[in-house]
């Protein structure tokens, strides 16, 4: 059961990382950048926090499954 949760968590984490937009898009991003000083918007901050939480969960499951074998 834990292995299934671990696989689902890894797939969701990979999908979340691929959905993220790149931070540096060259000189064209300066003209279209709406937020001053590069501060992330609330949605981007939420994605950052969600990614960190899922990574901690992924590594916790990896350590737990490694010791249970």
Curated annotation (Swiss-Prot):
Keywords: Chloroplast, Membrane, Plastid, Protein transport, Thylakoid, Translocation, Transmembrane, Transmembrane helix, Transport. It is a multi-pass membrane protein. GO terms for biological process: protein secretion. One of its GO terms (molecular function) is protein-transporting ATPase activity. It is found in: Plastid, Chloroplast thylakoid membrane. GO terms for cellular component: chloroplast thylakoid membrane. The keyword Plastid applies. The chain crosses the membrane at residues 1-21, 49-69. It comes from the Eukaryota. Pfam families: SecG. Belongs to the SecG family. NCBIfam families: secG. Involved in protein export. Participates in an early event of protein translocation across the chloroplast thylakoid membrane (Potential). This is Probable protein-export membrane protein secG.
